[in-house]
């Protein structure tokens, strides 16, 4: 990956080692650098289980908070695992989707020229809506983003904890397709060792069933590998989707 990824981390990031996680959204780390090590609390916006990533002594990279008045001055961006970085910031998929759209790096969104964040769809809001010029004949394209940090036997898998909210999103996407519009799931695999993608039926069998039901109904599934480094996050290749059991 180049030193100029689609999402570049701001200046002033710190690195160190993981100590513990408290109350889902707070992580204690010990900083590394020229000075004496210091223990600091940082914010984690990842409410998932982060299976396999919360290991004492594991590397951590955190970015400075945009708001200097925030109680926790840092946000965890990366966790180290077996010599690689794993992206754990759950805002990254949304940001990368928008950046890739404007950079023309989403072949599946070719012809779309307008991008709206947090677009209202009925009684819900979805992460993005893309629109094309009226004379293009292309229907609106609705996109929901998911962050993927779990890999088992080379298969990147989502979710890492049971998610009724995620199930709801798949049902909403199927309804959009029934209305004649496009609906897509953007799964960002923020680690290098996932070579294909599938729903984690061993974590949430309901979600896994809905995933394949949605795919069969016409919901488009786009699992992209992210290119993750200490410089930032870039968009990598599409990964193949594991077929449903028995196929």
Curated annotation (Swiss-Prot):
InterPro entries: SfsA, SfsA_C, SfsA_N
GO MF term set: DNA binding
Superkingdom classification of source: Bacteria
CDD domains: SfsA-like_bacterial (cd22359)
Similarity comment text for this entry: Belongs to the SfsA family.
PANTHER family (UniProt xref): SUGAR FERMENTATION STIMULATION PROTEIN A
Protein's name according to its UniProt entry: Sugar fermentation stimulation protein homolog
Encoding gene, per UniProt annotation: sfsA
């Amino acid at each position: 990956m180049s030193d100029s990824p689609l999402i570049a981390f701001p200046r002033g990031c710190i690195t160190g080692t993981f100590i513990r996680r408290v109350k889902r959204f707070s992580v204690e780390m010990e900083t590394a650098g020229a000075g004496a090590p210091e223990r600091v609390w940082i914010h984690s916006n990842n409410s998932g289980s982060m299976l396999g990533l919360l290991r004492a002594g594991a590397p951590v990279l955190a970015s400075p908070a945009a708001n200097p008045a925030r109680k926790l001055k840092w946000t965890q961006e990366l966790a180290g695992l077996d010599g690689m970085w794993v992206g754990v910031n759950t805002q990254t998929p949304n940001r990368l989707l928008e950046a890739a759209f404007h950079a023309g790096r989403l072949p599946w969104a070719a012809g779309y020229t307008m991008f709206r964040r947090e677009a209202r769809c009925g009684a819900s809001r979805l992460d993005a809506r893309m629109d094309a010029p009226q004379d293009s004949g292309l229907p609106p394209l609705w996109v929901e983003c998911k962050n993927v940090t779990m890999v088992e036997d080379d298969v990147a898998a989502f979710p890492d904890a049971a998610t009724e909210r995620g199930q709801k999103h798949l049902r909403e996407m199927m309804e959009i397709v029934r209305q004649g519009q496009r609906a897509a799931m953007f799964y960002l695999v923020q680690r290098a060792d996932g070579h294909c993608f599938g729903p984690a039926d061993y974590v949430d069998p309901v979600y896994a069933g809905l995933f394949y039901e949605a795919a069969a109904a016409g919901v488009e599934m786009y699992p992209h590998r992210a290119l993750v480094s200490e410089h930032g996050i870039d968009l990598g290749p599409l990964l193949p989707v594991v077929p449903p059991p028995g196929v």
